[in-house]
Amino acid sequence: FHTIYWPIILMALGEPLPKKVLGHPWLLMNNDKMSKSKGNMLYGDDLVRMFGLDAIRYYLLSEMGYQNDGNISYDAIISRTNIDLANIYGNLVSRTASMIKQYFGGIIPAPSANEEVDTALIETVRAEAKAAYDLLDKYYLSDAATHIIALLKACNKYIDDTTPWMLAKDESKRERLQNVMAYLVEGIRTATTLFTPYMPTTAENVAKLFGFDTSLDKLADFKCDFAGNTVGECGKLFARIDKAEFDKQLAKEAEEKEKKALEGKIDIEDFAKVSLV
């Protein structure tokens, strides 16, 4: 339709023709085509109810590239939600917000002199952000997501390398601790800005939490213009999904649907009493 009939209609109306038409491949269920007859259909409203809108948006956009078919399954959604969103992104946001509250009374500090580990983080964040931005500009959202996650992993590694809980015990390391907190927030801001097309609501909530701007012109600039902002209350961005509990709930819902479908139906004895004219 969009490459044959739509251009014909536009030409007939004298309207300008599209310069680019975006398409995407198939979405498979457990690497198989979805079909009602196979009983492997998934519906958007059910997925949103089970996992949340942003988690589903992220899964689909990070799973489906333009080159190959995408695959969807409950197990795959749970795995990506738990690893990418709960462990890598959500945990980083939660830890950073908690440490700023604990060590600086909730006020985001300004950075001071850099050390080698700081410079390494800045270079990694900028490199991954540029790679992600360039891919997003070409609509390669799946590939871009890989670089955003790599950026977040670098921030989590930065925490392990700098051990802020140890710095907090030594007053002479106060400025080092300021650097760590400020640069963690800058890393989160960069990832959150890039995540906006994937998870708009989550990105907005994280931006409000730290009070930072997610404008693209500030992407990975490391000027930390949010210093002095007060960190808000941080709940869990994404709760980890217990696979066993999910399977139990899924089986219960399937049983209830089957029971509901049988309601109102008559058995063979009742059918035999029916007079067909």
Report the location of each language-model feature.
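Short active-site loop/helix that positions an aromatic residue
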Residues: 3-13
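Long, charged, glycine-rich C-terminal linkers/tails
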Residues: 19-26
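Catalytic adenosine-cofactor/nucleotide-binding cores of aminoacyl-tRNA synthetases and other
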Residues: 26-119, 210-241, 245
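Short, hydrophobic/amphipathic alpha-helical patches that form generic packing surfaces
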Residues: 7-9, 57-64, 189-193
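Short, charged/polar, low-complexity loop and linker segments
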Residues: 69-74, 126-134
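Secondary-structure capping and boundary motifs in well-ordered enzyme cores
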Residues: 1, 36, 47-49, 77-88, ...
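Conserved, charged catalytic cores of large soluble enzymes
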Residues: 93-132, 152, 156-173, 248
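Basic, alpha-helical terminal appendages of large translation-related enzymes
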Residues: 134, 138-139, 149, 153-277
